[in-house]
């Protein structure tokens, strides 16, 4: 509970001119040997109406003098008790400290406010259950090097404590402490310093670590390699450059930059590299499935001109990384056919399908390549893109006329007939007559014989006229290039039509005339 006088003193900001020294003393607004006290704003005071101090600075002075009355007044004015304790320590005013010790939860909280080592150690001593290691830990934390120097002999003996303080100095980034410990007592392993510097992105500590290593005179190549791998993997250009000052392999940096898509790191060094090295990095980028931006960066330094196309294609296929092909295609460097050819020749239908999807290759293009390489499995699997069987047949049928190789046409005819055989009965009716003419045109005797049997199996009354017309049409299509097997099939069916008397006299004469021509072809 505040007294009425305390409430008045707390909120009194303007002192009347009529207040003399006696009145001010009675109000508790007078500081012996200093003069009147007046509050200014939230955190300053006015002494003798001409000297302005911060409330906390005044608290430190009052504490040093052991003036509890002024301390209480300044605490009313929202000063920080910690500054009064610091002042009391500087003036050895322990009676004042004891009056407020119940209000101090932990003297460690005061340590960050202390500037000199002597007061720092005295403050720490107020914490009853703390020992020397605790003091040294806080001295390290708050960069109190003189305290560490005072206990140098003890640190020289206690290796574990020394190593612990060194690690803490790294975590708290206390460079003076780090340098002093290493130069006076040495640390068994400096790796912790580099690891923390990298994790905190602290280039100053990292550089200091190499200075200390250099002073030892034993910078190992494996050490440099590890650091280059770590820093390049994180894209830390300045750390990489600092490491390279002491040696190391630039290829490690470039490999990591490609692997982790650090373009700024790559761009810095690419300008210095010969073309062959950049091409090797491009292959690595394909292998690691690098990002679009990384690939574009490498390609731009090659002017989108790749000399070793075969090697690039091998990497694209082996690592299933097609993005580089798309990027080159945008620059009118078309490698799709080459990629497709190698995939169709050497790999499964599933892998070909993956490449087709990634590079947006049309099914027709894939099927033509598969026909050229005699990969029936790929033709069949690719045709399943068209889910409707009739559509599959129509598309494959249209492709027959675009195939230049006879062996390719025969293979495609076999695939088409296989699809036809698996159709439902009603669906077969829709395509059988068209396919029969295709088979005749392509000299596919086996398939023609098979489909003619299917035509005969249909309802005679309904389909015989249509079948008769099919035979007549096929007979007209027969040329001297036709195979004898198809001619024999047609002869047999024409004889059957004569016997069944379903052919007109005019059609009969036409058949005889066509057969005569065919027979003459056979005898030539």
From Swiss-Prot:
Record flagged with keyword Cell membrane: no
Keywords assigned: Late protein
Induction: Expressed in the late phase of the viral replicative cycle.
UniProt function note: Plays a role in virus cell tropism, and may be required for efficient virus replication in macrophages.
UniProt family annotation: Belongs to the asfivirus MGF 505 family.
Protein name, entry field: Protein MGF 505-2R
């Amino acid at each position: 509970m505040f007294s009425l006088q305390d409430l008045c003193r707390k909120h009194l900001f303007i002192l009347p001119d009529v207040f003399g020294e006696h009145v001010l003393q009675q109000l508790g607004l007078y500081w012996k040997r200093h003069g009147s006290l007046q509050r200014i704003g939230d955190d300053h005071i006015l002494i003798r109406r001409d000297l302005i101090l911060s409330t906390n600075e005044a608290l430190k002075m009052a504490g040093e003098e052991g003036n509890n009355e002024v301390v209480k007044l300044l605490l009313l004015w929202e000063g920080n008790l910690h500054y009064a304790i610091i002042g009391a320590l500087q003036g050895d005013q322990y009676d004042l400290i004891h009056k407020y010790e119940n209000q101090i939860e932990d003297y460690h909280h005061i340590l960050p406010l202390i500037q000199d080592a002597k007061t720092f150690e005295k403050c720490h001593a107020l914490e009853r259950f703390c020992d020397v290691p605790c003091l040294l830990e806080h001295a390290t934390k708050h960069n109190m090097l003189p305290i560490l120097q005072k206990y140098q002999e003890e640190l020289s003996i206690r290796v574990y404590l020394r190593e612990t303080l060194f690690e803490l100095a790294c975590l708290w980034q206390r460079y003076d402490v780090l340098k002093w410990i290493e130069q006076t007592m040495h640390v068994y392993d400096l790796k912790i310093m580099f690891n923390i510097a990298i994790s905190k992105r602290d280039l100053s500590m990292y550089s200091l670590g190499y200075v200390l290593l250099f002073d030892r005179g034993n910078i190992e190549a494996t050490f440099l390699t590890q650091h280059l791998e770590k820093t390049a993997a994180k894209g830390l250009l300045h750390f990489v450059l600092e490491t390279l000052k002491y040696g190391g392999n630039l290829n490690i940096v470039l490999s990591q930059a490609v692997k982790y898509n650090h373009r700024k790191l790559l761009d810095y060094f690419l300008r210095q590299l010969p073309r062959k090295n950049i091409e090797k990095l491009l292959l690595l980028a394909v292998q690691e499935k690098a990002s679009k931006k990384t690939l574009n960066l490498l390609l731009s330094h090659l002017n989108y001109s790749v000399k070793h196309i075969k090697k690039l294609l091998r990497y694209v296929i082996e690592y299933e990384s097609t993005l580089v092909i798309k990027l080159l295609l945008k620059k009118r460097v078309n490698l799709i056919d080459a990629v497709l050819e190698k995939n169709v020749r050497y790999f499964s239908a599933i892998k070909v399908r993956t490449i087709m999807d990634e590079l947006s290759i049309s099914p027709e293009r894939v099927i033509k390549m598969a026909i050229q390489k005699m990969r029936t499995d790929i033709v069949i699997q690719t045709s399943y893109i068209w889910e409707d069987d009739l559509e599959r047949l129509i598309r494959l049928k249209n492709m027959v006329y675009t195939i230049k190789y006879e062996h390719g046409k025969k293979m495609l005819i076999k695939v088409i007939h296989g699809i036809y055989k698996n159709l439902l009965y009603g669906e077969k009716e829709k395509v059988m007559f068209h396919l029969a003419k295709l088979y005749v045109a392509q000299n596919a005797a086996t398939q023609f014989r098979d489909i003619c049997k299917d035509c005969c199996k249909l309802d005679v009354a309904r389909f015989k006229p249509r079948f008769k017309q099919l035979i007549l049409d096929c007979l007209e299509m027969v040329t001297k290039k036709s195979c004898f097997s198809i001619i024999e099939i047609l002869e047999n069916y024409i004889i059957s039509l004569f016997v069944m008397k379903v052919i007109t006299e005019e059609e009969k004469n036409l058949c005889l005339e066509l057969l005569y021509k065919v027979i003459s072809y056979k005898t030539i």
